[in-house]
Amino acid sequence: MSKLQDVIVQEMKVKKRIDSAEEIAELKQFIKSYVQSHSFIKSLVLGISGGQDSTLVGKLVQMSVNELREEGIDCTFIAVKLPYGVQKDADEVEQALQFIEPDEIVTVNIKPAVDQSVQSLKEAGIVLTDFQKGNEKARERMKVQFSIASNRQGIVVGTDHSAENITGFYTKYGDGAADIAPIFGLNKRQGRQLLAYLGAPKQLYEKTPTADLEDDKPQLPDEDALGVTYEAIDNYLEGKPVTPEEQKVIENHYIRNAHKRELAYTRYTWPKS
C-alpha cells in the first residue's frame, strides 16, 4: 500500500469487512444519538432518488425514527421526491418508497426553479453548460430539502459514503450538503450488502449507479463519468491492491476534489501545512 493510500484509507474509515447486523445497529445508534442530543429536531428529511444510497439511508432513518418514537421522542421522517420534470426511473423511486415505508412523502418538481435559474443567468450573460445545469439540479434538490427541514423543525440527512467522498463525486453544496451523513465509512459494496440484509428489492441495489444530472447524457453511469469502477474504488478503500492506472485515477480525484471535503477555507486553514 502506498503512503497516500494509507492516509486515505485512514481518513475514509472503511473497514475491510462488516457484520451487517452490527453495522446497522451502529448506524441507527448514530442517527438516534444525534436526534436525542438536539431537542429541537422534530423531523428528518431525505431526498429519495430510487438509487442504492438514498434507499439505504432512507430505510435506516425510518427504522431509527420508529425506535425513537417507541422511546418517547416525537420525530417524523419526511421522504422527498425531487423529479426534474418526468423522472425516467420513477418506478424505482416508488419501489424504494415501498421498501422504506416513510412516515410522510413530499413531492417537489424542481424543473421550473432550475429552468428559471438557468434562464435568469443567461439573461445576465452567463450561459451554463449542460454539466453546469446538472449541478444546478443537485443544488436545487438540496435547497428544497433544507427548506422543508426549516419549515418542519428538522435536519437534512445526506447519502455521502466513502466511495463518493474519496472521488468527490457529488455537487459542492448540492448533494454534498447535509446535516448528518450516516453512511460515511461504508464503500459501495458494503452498502449493497446492508440493503440485501435488510431485504430490499435486488433491482434497487444491483442497478447501474448514475447521478442522472445531464440532459445530454441521461442515465450516464457513475463509473463512466469517474473513469474507474466502484470495484476498484472499494478495493482501494479496503487497503487492497489496485492497478497503477486505477490508483492514479482514484488519487487524482481525491487530490483535485479536496476542496469539496472542506468548509470554506480561512486564513487559518489554508494553505495546509
From Swiss-Prot:
Protein's pathway: Cofactor biosynthesis; NAD(+) biosynthesis; NAD(+) from deamido-NAD(+) (ammonia route): step 1/1
- Could you give a single Gene Ontology term from the biological process aspect? NAD biosynthetic process
Sites binding ATP sit at G47, I48, S49, G50, G51, Q52, D53, S54, T159, K188, T210
Q: Does the keyword Magnesium apply?
A: yes
Q: Please give the catalytic activity noted in the UniProt record.
A: deamido-NAD(+) + NH4(+) + ATP = AMP + diphosphate + NAD(+) + H(+)
The GO terms describing molecular function are: ATP binding; glutaminase activity; metal ion binding; NAD+ synthase (glutamine-hydrolyzing) activity; NAD+ synthase activity
Its keywords, alphabetically, are: ATP-binding, Ligase, Magnesium, Metal-binding, NAD, Nucleotide-binding
Q: Which InterPro entries does the UniProt record give?
A: NAD/GMP_synthase, NAD_synthase, NH(3)-dep_NAD(+)_synth, Rossmann-like_a/b/a_fold
Give the EC number(s) listed in the UniProt record: 6.3.1.5
The entry marks the following residues as binding deamido-NAD(+), namely R139, K172, D179, H259, K260
Task: Output the Pfam families linked to this UniProt entry.
Answer: NAD_synthase
Q: Which residues bind Mg(2+)?
A: D53, E164
Going by the record, the broad EC class of this enzyme is: ligase
Q: GO terms for CC?
A: cytoplasm
Its subunit composition reads: Homodimer.
Q: Which NCBIfam families match?
A: nadE, PRK00768.1
Q: Provide the function of this protein.
A: Catalyzes the ATP-dependent amidation of deamido-NAD to form NAD. Uses ammonia as a nitrogen source.
The family note in this entry says: Belongs to the NAD synthetase family.
Please state what the protein is called.
NH(3)-dependent NAD(+) synthetase
Q: Which organism was this protein described from?
A: Staphylococcus aureus (strain MRSA252)
Q: What is the lineage of its organism?
A: Bacteria, Bacillati, Bacillota, Bacilli, Bacillales
Which gene holds the coding sequence for this protein? nadE
